[in-house]
From Swiss-Prot:
Organism: Paracoccidioides lutzii (strain ATCC MYA-826 / Pb01) (Paracoccidioides brasiliensis)
Assigned protein family: Belongs to the peptidase M28 family.
Pfam families noted in UniProt: Peptidase_M28, PFF1_C, PFF1_TM
Name used for this protein in its record: Vacuolar membrane protease
Membrane-spanning segments: 25-45, 392-412, 448-468, 476-496, 510-530, 535-555, 673-693, 710-730, 738-758
Site residues, Transition state stabilizer: 319
GO molecular function, one term: metalloexopeptidase activity
EC numbers: 3.4.-.-
Ligand binding (Zn(2+) 2): 187, 222, 320
Binding site for Zn(2+) 1: 175, 187, 247
Residues glycosylated per entry: 59, 116, 119, 238, 806, 847, 955
Compartment(s) of residence: Vacuole membrane
Enzyme class: hydrolase
Length: 993
């Protein structure tokens, strides 16, 4: 007889059954499909449109050429090329306005303000008990006002204390200065050329804005947001109520929505065709995890405007280096920022409501109204979700209460119907002391143990990388991700398979989802508390995660209604046990299966025929057409508890997998797919987005002296969050995928431990400055970076050969600063007859006049071939005043901690600043004596410090030979960036007695 005929119940292949092959294939396909979509969103920039498909009024070819011209050289505020860029921008603006005004009559009025009058004295506000830094700055901003159709028709800014009537306008800002070591293609050239295209777009016929639009080309952002601060002194700062800030903190890719002030203004970003960003970045600023700032903090914090911050965020290794140029970016990135700017600005200038024009509680700020905190994130870079944080809080509280309640009610219903197999060890037979084992506790603690072990292993790998090769994530973030994810899946699969081998359980899924439900419930509680008390919305993904987990868990509980009643199962099992016991005595006389009559089953039990052909009774199966007895069994030990399985038999009950509980044969075999689709896609999308955003933004923070362990720890924890939805099914996986992932893990682990962390495409940033002491003629070149790579770089510099570099702790974290004597700079052109010693150089002119009998002095400072100087004091001064400067109580220039440094910026070259300073008497330290007499506390009325001037122009070779040398001889994997506002700082010491 053929095998098929011998076993008429051979199962047919079910492509959606909860069996190894379908589970392995379907889960792999789902995870790969969604992960690939998430990766494509982050790695592929949407292509720029052709000229024919571009919006009317936008010329992308022209924008790219403008970017190439703008980035033709370094143009920091303190450089001659910065003046050239300023003049070029005025020319381009005038050309665009002239072209459109001549082309049609129905175009808006345009007013161009070349602001060479505004100035301001202010400070950094102080940190803790530290003295503050004071700043004096003179504006060279260019402000373009496009009058809206509903704007005040009068030129109100021409009147003394004139104020606009009607609704507030919209500000779009970008800064046209670069750092001294970067060409500024993305920081902030793309923002600047986007402003030029916005000017072109809104000045053609048919595109006239309803509300006035102000385009601010600000100068001086890189040196402490100076351009935005001095904009506060211009009349237009009182007109605008909303803003869009265009920035660059990377060197390409997609422009990310960095942060926003409120929900209402964020909704205009939904107009973008390719939105990109998450509220997670904005909360990073709130929590202080992101230290750098943009003009956003001035527009919102000082002026009270409501708006958005859009910025490039990667790769950080090119930020502020010579690779921030047009060659290392592309027109697609330019189009992404420009398209976002057009869509958002068009929405803002077309808005007819009054949300941004109501009174505010702070009288020092514009009447832009009060917004609500928001939650926002993109989906595959094609859709954008935005809603109020209060809404998230309300939904979270509702779900935190209702989800456990629903599961509790479902559990009660299961208990009432005698189908609550969860947490059930056995079932007593009515009227007897005999119990039947249900094995319902199998797998109860499997999930927390295995998930804890896998997470601990990934965290251990994070520690290992931090100790052995801490900066590998700088260039190989995907190798780190691959290592973490592959080891997580393999370890989880291996442990789950071992547990399933020794203690198989049909309740594995239900217990797994229950534990995940508990864990995510706790996470949502924490997230909800932070949202309510601190306004932190970064945990938004936990709400959706928990909601999906709840639904998947509920499905597992609802599945249990398909099981037989526990009492019925125990009764049927007991009958089977008695039949088997009665047959043991005659087993030797029992004929073989081939000798049995056709109505006798292969296990010695009579075939009762089709149950559909009999009248139903109390013992009839709830699911007709299914067997109601459990003929395959095993007798337990001497405990009096009996348990029945198919052990020792070749024919298994239909629906039972392996050696799982025999009562599980009626469980649906397809609901696992529903659970997978309910949970996995939303988790991959949201957690994958969070993970990529974190590692993309933070993978290269090591070069700034920040510990990279936080990046590895994030990868480890997010791996658990990302693949926890897979765990309820992972014990069904075949060995093929986990074995392949084990090989991936071994390969990536070896690579991550031994590979060199930097490359020409992902360079290590090292920071340069040269300091010259004009009193004794000495100079020192200083490089700041991380060890041992800093030493490797210095060893490659010819001028450092034969010298012992003096290394000290750097300004932050693990940074180290090393100095040596280098070739002298030539930032000031000397008379041909002058010798080349440093002493006679007259780079800085200064004069100090002390007021008799008072701790007051007037300091006049001027530097040759520069427009940036500063005063540093050994002891902070109490107050200072700059001749001819404006002050603004919104931007205080002093504090109780005193002022340790005063930075001076001028729009004119070789300007003379006049600074008046006041200082307190400084008590002599114990043990000191002013005149060598008896030790006593006397006052020292002197003030000492340095007069320093800065040079930042690096466009001509040979002006700063030390910088040229470092760039020429540093390894290819090193990028040179500025260490301070100036590349060269020259100083004189002074003492005022």
């Amino acid at each position: 007889m053929s095998p098929a005929m011998a076993n008429p119940r051979v199962r047919k292949f079910n492509p959606i059954a909860f069996t190894p092959l379908p589970v392995t294939l379907i889960t792999t396909i789902v995870y790969l499909a969604v992960l690939i979509l998430v990766l494509v969103t982050y790695l592929v920039v949407p292509p720029a449109p052709t000229l024919e498909m571009s919006p009317r009024g936008v010329n992308l070819t022209e924008a790219w050429r403008d970017l190439q011209h703008l980035t033709g050289g370094f143009h920091p505020y303190n450089s001659r090329r910065n003046d050239d860029v300023h003049a070029w921008l005025l020319h381009r603006i005038e050309a665009i306005v002239r072209e459109h005004s001549a082309a049609a009559d129905d175009v808006p009025e345009v007013f161009v303000f070349d602001d060479n009058l505004s100035n301001l004295t202010y400070s950094n506000g102080g940190v803790s008990k530290s003295p503050i830094v004071g700043v004096y700055f003179e504006s060279t901003n260019i402000i373009v006002y496009i009058r809206g159709s509903e704007d005040d028709p009068q030129n109100w800014w021409e009147w003394s204390n004139g104020k606009p009537k009607g609704k507030g306008g919209v500000l779009v800002n970008a800064h046209y200065d670069s750092v001294s070591t970067g060409y500024g293609a993305t920081d902030d050239g793309m923002g600047v050329v986007s402003l030029l295209q916005l000017l072109r777009y809104f000045t053609i016929a048919g595109n006239k804005p309803r509300k006035g639009l102000v385009l601010l080309f600000n100068n001086g952002e890189e040196d402490y947001l100076n351009g935005a601060r001095v904009y506060s002194q211009h009349a237009m700062s009182n007109f605008t109520h909303t803003f869009l800030n265009l920035e660059g903190a990377g060197a390409g890719g997609r422009a990310c929505l960095f942060r926003t002030t409120d929900t209402e203004v964020t909704r205009f970003y939904k107009n973008a065709k390719h939105p990109f960003g998450s509220v997670l970045a904005g909360d990073g600023f709130k929590l202080g995890l992101i230290r750098s700032q943009t003009d956003y903090v001035v527009f919102n914090g000082v002026l009270g405007l409501r708006g958005l911050d859009v910025s490039f965020i990667a790769p950080r290794s090119r930020y502020h280096t010579d690779q921030d140029d047009a060659r290392h970016t592309n027109v697609d990135s330019l189009w992404h920022m420009l398209s976002v700017a057009i869509a958002t600005t068009e929405g803002l200038v077309s808005y007819t409501g009054t949300d941004f024009d109501s009174k505010t509680t702070d009288q020092d700020k514009v009447n832009s109204g009060d917004g609500t905190l928001g939650v926002w994130f993109d989906i595959f870079g094609s859709a954008f979700a935005v809603f109020r944080l209060h809404t998230l809080f309300a939904l979270s509280v509702t779900l935190l209460v209702s989800a456990p309640l629903v599961l509790f009610i479902t559990s009660i219903a299961l208990s009432k119907t005698d189908r609550m197999y969860l947490f059930s060890m056995s079932k007593s037979l009515g009227g007897t002391s005999e119990t039947v084992s249900l094995r319902g506790l199998r797998g109860l603690f499997r999930t927390p143990i295995i998930l804890t072990v896998t997470t601990v292993i990934t965290i251990g790998l994070a520690y290992l990388l931090e100790k052995i090769n801490p900066y590998i994530v700088h260039s190989s973030q995907f190798a780190v991700w691959s290592m973490m994810l592959s080891v997580w899946i393999f370890v989880a699969w291996f442990l789950a398979r071992v547990a399933d081998f020794f203690r198989p359980s049909a309740l594995h899924r239900a217990y797994s989802y229950t534990w995940i439900f508990i864990a995510t419930w706790i996470m949502l509680v924490i997230s909800t508390v932070y949202a309510n008390q601190k306004g932190i919305a970064a945990g938004y993904f936990i709400f959706f995660y928990f909601a999906a987990v709840f639904l998947a868990t509920w499905v597992s509980y609802l599945e249990l209604f398909s099981l037989p009643r526990k009492g019925y199962y125990a009764h049927q099992t007991s009958r089977g046990q008695r039949r088997r016991s009665s047959s043991l005595s005659s087993r030797l006389l029992t004929p073989s299966a081939d000798e049995l009559p056709s109505d006798i089953g292969p296990n010695g039990a009579e075939n009762l025929g089709d149950p559909d052909e009999t009248d139903p009774t109390e013992s009839t199966s709830l699911l007709r057409g299914q067997r109601t007895t459990f003929a395959n069994y095993r007798t337990g030990g001497n405990s009096g508890v009996t348990e029945y399985t198919a052990e020792g038999e070749h024919v298994r009950e239909a629906g039972i997998f392996g050696h799982e509980q025999s009562w599980s044969w009626t469980l649906p075999r397809w609901t696992w797919i529903l659970q997978l689709l309910l949970l996995a896609p939303i988790v991959i999308i949201l957690v994958g987005q969070v993970g990529l955003l974190l590692t993309t933004a933070m993978s290269q923070i090591g070069s700034d002296g920040v510990s990279t362990f936080i990046v590895y720890l994030a990868c480890a924890l997010l791996s658990t969050l990302l693949f926890a939805p897979l765990f309820p099914f992972i014990h069904r996986f075949t060995y093929h995928v986990p074995t392949f992932l084990l090989l991936i893990f071994i390969g990536t682990l070896i690579y991550n431990l031994v590979a060199f962390p930097f490359s020409p495409a992902n360079r290590l940033k090292i920071f340069f400055i040269q300091e010259v002491n004009l009193d004794d003629g000495t100079n020192k070149v200083s490089l700041t970076g991380i060890q041992p790579y800093l030493t490797n770089t210095i060893n490659a510099i010819p001028s450092a050969a034969g010298q012992t570099a003096n290394c000290t702790q750097g300004p932050f974290g693990s940074l180290v600063r090393c100095s040596w004597s280098g070739p002298p700079p030539r930032v000031v052109k000397e008379d041909p007859g002058n010798d080349q010693t440093m002493g006679p150089y007259t780079w800085i002119s200064y004069n100090i006049t002390k007021t008799v009998g008072k701790n007051e002095a007037r300091i006049k400072v001027s530097g040759r071939n520069t427009r940036a100087c500063k005063l540093k004091f050994d002891n902070p001064v109490a107050d200072y005043r700059i001749s001819g400067s404006a002050v603004d109580h919104r931007l205080p220039h002093t504090s109780r901690q005193g002022v340790a440094e005063i930075r001076l910026w001028s729009r004119t070259w070789e300007n003379t600043w006049v600074v008046d300073v006041d200082w307190h008497s400084n008590p002599v330290k114990p043990g000191e004596s002013k005149d060598g007499d008896e030790k006593q506390d006397v006052s020292k009325n002197e003030l000492s410090g340095k007069v320093i001037c800065l040079w930042s122009d690096n466009n001509e070779s040979g002006v700063i030979p030390a910088l040229d040398e470092v760039r020429l001889y540093a390894p290819a994997w090193v990028a040179i960036s500025k260490s301070a506002d100036g590349l060269v700082e020259a100083s004189h010491d002074f003492i005022i007695q």
